[in-house]
Amino acid sequence: FGGEPLMNFGVVKGIVEYARSIEKEHNKNFRFTITTNGILLNDEIMDYINKNMHNVVLSLDGRKEVNDRMRPRAGGQGSYDNIVPKFQKLADSRNQTDYYVRGTFTHYNLDFAKDVMHMADLGFKQISVEPVVADPAEPYAISEEDLPVIFKEYEDLAVDIIKRRKEGQWFNFFHFMIDLTGGPCVTKRLVGCGSGTEYLAVTPTGDLYPCHQFVGKTEFKM
């Protein structure tokens, strides 16, 4: 994946404005989510996001050394020190709801539970850390041999989260938010994913795909 929407924020606002102008005509209620690496966040953009975005995804991979290894700036310096204060401000401005910090763990940080707990220590209450999807030839790619370590890490993370909740230090970890009476994961677990039911990817050239994972694979172009 790639692309930072705040690099062309005028288009973001144009999309929202256009959708709002046609939703009543088509009996729709559009909900917008924006994903950002935070480099270009400022007070004006935060205010717009809080007024127009149903959800916000803030890209942060956890500990400073982990984040800066995978998310360097154009000049090679790390991004952690620049983005964390902005993310904290935005999360607090949304009352710690309707957002999540989204990290990616790789072969480099199979001890990702430490990254989850680090983000919790930063004050974030909505946290998601997902496994990387990468070419197997990449040095940071996850291999089958890594799975026992990953499974153990999830178990240790569950223990840590339970301990913190008993101490009154709660936070939500997306993969553990399972409520069979209507939790956020239950529908996806039943149907596999939102492709074909609630999901559509639109490219900059206007091509349609059932999911962003398929973009560029012409056999899936709709």
Give the ranges of each region predicted by the language model.
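Cysteine-cluster motifs in flexible loop/terminal segments that predominantly coordinate metals
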Residues: 222
